[in-house]
């Protein structure tokens, strides 16, 4: 959407280069693919869920020329390694980048590595000095924690919401994004999840995106979304909504066993529901609230 930071930033880049912009009334995977060929689009910007829907259109992709695409830039949600591989398969000429920014603090948070190291495909980039930091409790130079930002683009506050504004800033004036990041050995950051998406299962903190990435490494899983349901003993437990790849007959038990073999036991989904596609919000992110509402029936199945 043009009222979000990504839409605004990309428009500025295009206008600065005297380039045209293709705007669609709403996202539809088939129309998106057709527009790329019709207008010979060179740069795509999207949310990961959009590209996950695009790569599923095998029949249309096989008859459409997408060779014009040189850059695919994603943001606003975690990107899995499997999705990157799928995009490279259908867009072999394209460079894939994963970006980050917030409407409250602008798009300039991450940049190039000072030693020229290549950005890993699923990383959001290297933090710009004095603009981004990871905070874990009193540690403001953490390797794993909430991302805080401070730069000239940071908003003065939310309009007529003084309490929400106060909650959004640290005592020393940094904007608290609510996004959990981790840093690798080279200093690149990776999106882990949202502070408000995290839930506790039997004393263990679970970030849904970590479980989703693990599940999406399975060769027969196209997409996965994990939401919590209440549990009298554990507090909350994970439930997974899964889109299988075409032709797959992967079972619920097969997914549970895969999760137990490839991640901590507490992360494995107690119930798996198969869906044709995941619901999206108006900003093309996965609509977790709608899945939350559907997870109650899944909770009853696990009793």
Model-derived features: positions:
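Conserved AMP-binding/adenylation subdomain of ANL enzymes
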Residues: 3-42, 57
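Gly/Ser/Thr-rich phosphate-binding loop
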Residues: 16, 41-46, 55-119, 133, ...
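Short hydrophobic/charged patches on amphipathic alpha-helices used for structural packing
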Residues: 30-33, 61-63, 166, 212
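AMP-binding/adenylate-forming catalytic core of the ANL superfamily
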Residues: 44, 151, 156-157, 180-267, ...
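Active-site glycine-centered loops adjacent to acidic/histidine catalytic or metal-binding residues
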Residues: 76, 101, 125, 179, ...
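Beta-strand->loop->alpha-helix junctions that form or flank phosphate-binding loops
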Residues: 96-104, 123-127, 227-230, 273
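Conserved ATP/PPi-binding loop(s) of AMP-dependent carboxylate-activating enzymes
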Residues: 126-129, 138-168, 204-206
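Acidic/polar alpha-helix N-cap and adjacent early helical turns
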Residues: 293-303
């Amino acid at each position: 959407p043009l009222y979000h930071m990504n839409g605004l930033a990309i428009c500025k880049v295009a206008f600065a280069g005297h380039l045209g912009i293709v705007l669609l009334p709403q996202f539809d995977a088939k129309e998106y693919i057709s527009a790329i060929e019709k207008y010979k689009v060179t740069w795509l910007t999207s949310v990961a869920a959009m590209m996950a829907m695009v790569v599923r259109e095998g029949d249309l992709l096989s008859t459409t020329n997408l060779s014009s695409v040189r850059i695919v830039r994603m943001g606003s949600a975690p990107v899995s390694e499997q999705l990157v591989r799928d995009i490279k398969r259908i867009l072999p000429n394209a460079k894939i980048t994963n970006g980050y920014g917030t409407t409250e603090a602008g798009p300039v948070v991450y940049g190039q590595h000072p030693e020229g190291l290549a950005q890993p495909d699923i990383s959001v980039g290297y933090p710009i000095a004095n603009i981004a930091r990871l905070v874990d409790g009193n540690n403001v130079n953490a390797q794993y924690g909430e991302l805080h930002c401070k730069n000239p683009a940071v908003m003065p506050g939310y309009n007529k919401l003084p309490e929400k504004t106060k909650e959004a800033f640290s005592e020393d004036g940094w904007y608290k994004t609510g996004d959990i990041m981790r840093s690798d050995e080279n200093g690149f950051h990776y999106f882990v999840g949202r502070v408000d998406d995290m839930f506790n299962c039997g004393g263990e903190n679970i970030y849904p995106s970590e479980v989703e990435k693990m599940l999406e490494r399975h060769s027969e899983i196209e997409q996965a979304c994990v939401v919590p349901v209440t549990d009298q003993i554990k507090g909350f437990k994970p439930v997974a909504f899964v889109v299988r790849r075409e032709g797959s007959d992967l079972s619920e038990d097969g997914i549970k066993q895969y999760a137990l073999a490839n991640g901590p036991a507490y992360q494995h989904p107690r119930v798996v529901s198969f869906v044709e596609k995941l619901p999206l919000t108006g900003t093309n992110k996965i609509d977790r609230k709608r899945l939350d509402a559907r997870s109650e029936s899944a909770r009853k199945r696990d009793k």
